[in-house]
Amino acid sequence: MSESYKNAGVDIEAGYEAVKRMKKHVERTKRIGAMGGLGGFGGMFDLSELPYKQPVLISGTDGVGTKLKLAFAMDKHDTIGIDAVAMCVNDVLAQGAEPLFFLDYLAVGKADPVKIEEIVKGVAEGCVQSGSALVGGETAEMPGLYTEDEYDIAGFSVGAAEKDGIVTGENISEGHLLIGLSSSGLHSNGFSLVRKVLLEDAGLNLDETYAPFERPLGEELLEPTKIYVKPVLEAVKSGKIAGMAHVTGGGFIENLPRMMPDGLGVEIDIGSWPVPPIFPFIQEKGGLKSEEMFNVFNMGIGFVLAVKEEDMTDVIQTLENNGEKAYLIGRVKAGSGVVFGGAGLS
């Protein structure tokens, strides 16, 4: 053991202990195609073991943003890894890809093996939910860059789709309907605004329970991002999905146009789905306009699929048969961007 390195803030032995603690969680993520074990220089995956004829690899990378600040404040680290996986695999899913494997990057101010295990346990849980093998990663101790209690996490997902089955949105046309899938809450976006409104301006306490919630505010805010992989892949198999969008940073206004061909926009029917209480709670505490809410948050819809009108019932049935709550939330119209109807904006 290097005492000089330890005195400089890097504890190699603690790093070794963290890796030992990770192994049982990584083992949970084994799937067909995964090769090798933890500790190699590169993660391996044998695509030939899967029944693809013309596979196209589709990748995505993302992080969790300032939701981490709440994990630090609550000293709760077992779900933030789920968020890291969800942000990546839901993006890959939006192209119709089956997530295959995942890598994580964890940078810490101080290597605490117990805390690192909690974080990686969450990553492994996200991988299990999405069917991804956790084939590798990096844990870097960076004293001076982060405080001892701080860390950052990012992930990288690789999935595959048949070449003729990639969902690009290019076949969306006027009259297609939009199916929205319920979110679990805030997911992993908008937390800088959340902290400003609820903690700085309103002075609320993360450890207290406020109406209408039945658990402390911090736990409500840390609810992990929903992973949509399994129900959506079942719907994709039908060949009836023309386009998909993962509703993340920028909310409806930024993300729905990303799946639209030029010359088309969407009309969203406000009131066509139940909005989780965390959103009106934030809106009321911050005096925020509805338009701003839809430009920052998912507002209760975390994933959107575009389908032909005649396919809507079958697709919703498939999603609900696989445990997902699905709602008809709007339609595709000539134009651009996102307009809101129904109950309107205030």
Swiss-Prot record:
A GO MF term: phosphoribosylamine-glycine ligase activity
Position of the signal peptide: none
Keyword terms of this UniProt record: ATP-binding, Cytoplasm, Ligase, Nucleotide-binding, Purine biosynthesis
Keyword Ligase: yes
Coiled coil start-end: none
UniProt xrefs under Pfam families: AIRS, AIRS_C
Catalysed reactions listed for this entry: 2-formamido-N(1)-(5-O-phospho-beta-D-ribosyl)acetamidine + ATP = 5-amino-1-(5-phospho-beta-D-ribosyl)imidazole + ADP + phosphate + H(+)
Top EC group: ligase
InterPro entries: PurM-like_C_dom, PurM-like_C_sf, PurM-like_N, PurM-like_N_sf, PurM_cligase
Intracellular or extracellular location(s): Cytoplasm
CDD domains: PurM
One GO cellular component term noted in the UniProt record for this chain: cytosol
Pathway(s) annotated for this protein in UniProt: Purine metabolism; IMP biosynthesis via de novo pathway; 5-amino-1-(5-phospho-D-ribosyl)imidazole from N(2)-formyl-N(1)-(5-phospho-D-ribosyl)glycinamide: step 2/2
One of the GO BP terms on file: adenine biosynthetic process
EC number: 6.3.3.1
Family: Belongs to the AIR synthase family.
PANTHER family: TRIFUNCTIONAL PURINE BIOSYNTHETIC PROTEIN ADENOSINE-3, TRIFUNCTIONAL PURINE BIOSYNTHETIC PROTEIN ADENOSINE-3-RELATED
Protein name: Phosphoribosylformylglycinamidine cyclo-ligase
Organism: Bacillus licheniformis (strain ATCC 14580 / DSM 13 / JCM 2505 / CCUG 7422 / NBRC 12200 / NCIMB 9375 / NCTC 10341 / NRRL NRS-1264 / Gibson 46)
Gene that encodes the chain: purM
